[in-house]
Amino acid sequence: MVHYDGYESETRMVRVKADEKVDFAVIEAKDGSKRRPASGSAVTRSSSDASERATYASPRRELKYVSTTAASTVVSADAPSPSDGESTRIPLADGGVIEKKAGHGVLTAGEVNDFAKWTQWQDIAGNTLSALKDLWAMAPSGRYTLDLQNKSGLPIADAVVHLKKKDGTELYSARTDNTGKAELWAALDPMAPLPKERLFMEVEYRGRTTRVDNVKPFERAVNRMVLDVPCGPSDLVDVAFVVDATGSMQDELDFLTAEMNDIIFRSKRINDKLNFRFANVFYRDIGSSEEYATRSMDFSRVLSASVNFISDQRADGGGDVPEAVDLALDSAINHLSWSAEARARILFLILDAGPHITPDVQAKIRTLTKQAAGKGIRIVPITASGTGKATEYLMRSLALGTNGTYTFLTNHSGVGNSHLEPTTDHYDVESLNDLLVRVLKSYTYMPGCDQQIPELELDYADSLV
């Protein structure tokens, strides 16, 4: 029986291997060290995305891609050890099949934080992936960063920050994250001209509005502000899983289900003072043959409720590559009951294809990005097998627009079809559940009110380098 104080308890008979007992502990493992790859474990791999390229090709111009091979390093020295569960038969190209148990710890993944590789992202977006700006009509540009602290030097989280023109027209709004930083953009539409005038910011926090004049773009400086307010961050953390449940996801959905369930229960070990709430949105596509377009469960502190909802979902439908991503994001961003005040709001977007490309959908994606940023919802895409460069670009843009990070499944697990190598220089390979728990930790950690910020090399996915 798994029981957490204040939560529903649920009794299930499970078989637990010796090395899996730690999964049921509510404390961190004694050995908190991170295993690094042995010498010579770096691998390189590249893949093509011809099917998506054909689907998303513009009728006016042929999209050409310059192949950029990324080096990946396997972080875990040992092969992942899945928990017992139902086995999944995975077809092979030669007609054979292999069986893998759909337990947690099987899927492997990597992360590209484009805030941490800002110069490289500008080069990639302006060259290798430049054609995709027009395809999606999406290109976060004119970056402005605010660092907000109190007089003790502690970060102020969840303050609302508006970026405005001198006539008061709002260009963007965002909320400060757990490090006290807010990322704002002068434009998302690549056709929109960047303002040449001086801009200002308005900061709203606990009923008080403060103005910051003559703010500088990120290329020139990080804008800093100190408020005379007491320390007292919220202990609320909202996490939503938005999952593509079309037929093309079947090869990995059982494994993703196990990973999501594991992450939900491991959240209690991150910080016992935090109150996590979980919500879910599963989506397919639009059409009379679809069982549903979106199916959701609102936020709940009952962990088993979210686990049971996820476990009941199956992949089916779809057919064409584009899916109802915009409907799913709208359902999650605007119809889930996100906390009015929170330390962090995180949306994990799991998919293998982008939305339909029409002017209305393009405009809607930009609007949804701004709405998410304004509510402090950080989008963390997780791309699965079958993803192409067009979807990769859009997902990385969504992450930038909402102060998130881009993650992706890799071939190292042997699960699913071929996974696209991201356009970057290097990434580490981790088990997916460990990577996402690390993201949760990095988005929720804050120093205590009675201490100064430690001068340490913390493994946090900060928005600045």
Predicted regions and their residues:
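Short loop/turn and low-complexity linker motifs enriched in small/turn-promoting residues
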Residues: 1-37
